Amino acid sequence: KSPSLLISVERCGASEDGIYRNMRDVDISNYTAKIDTLFDLFPTSIGIGDGGNEIGLGNVAKWVTKSQELVQFPARTKVTKLILSSVSNWGAYGLVAALSLKAGINLLPNTTEEAQLIKHMVNSGAVDGISGEAAYRVDGFELGEYLWALDKLNEITDIRLH
């Protein structure tokens, strides 16, 4: 079967000049799979981003370029629905929370699992997206701060389901 929907979370998209850049406007084209092409061709899609360089931020590119906090060269790829969030993962968790309410079961990861995953990724070489440091942080947020949002979404989702 063919997919009915494409979803992109924190996935770098090419800017108008065809270059893939990270949040610091560094060219990462050689390290980036060109999946934004799929989104250009597919009729139904969701993009979740936080900095302007992600697939879907083409929907708001003219506003991204006016911001001092976001990238200078926004992604050009547009999506059917765009979710903006301070941290892309938080936007994805929000989507999963909404799907949980539709499904009648909490589909969100718990904070213990998420903390273990982040620690494993950092221990395997991942770095924080803001500082570039190998630290237990996500987009500049300390692990506890980052997990607080997931914990609250789990709490709210559980309350709404029961």
Annotate the PLM regions.
Residues 15-18, 53-58:
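Short acidic/glycine-rich loop or secondary-structure boundary segments that cap or lie
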Residues 1-39:
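An acidic, phosphate/nucleotide-engaging active-site surface
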Residues 5, 44-48:
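Hydrophobic/aromatic beta-strand patches that form the interior of the parallel beta-sheet core
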Residues 55-162:
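C-terminal functional extensions of proteins
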Residues 17, 25-27, 36, 40, ...:
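Acidic-enriched, low-complexity/disordered segments with a strong bias for Aspartate over Glutamate
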Residues 9-12, 48-51, 98:
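Fold-independent oxyanion-binding glycine-rich loops
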Residues 34-45, 99-103:
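A structural motif corresponding to the C-terminal end of an alpha-helix
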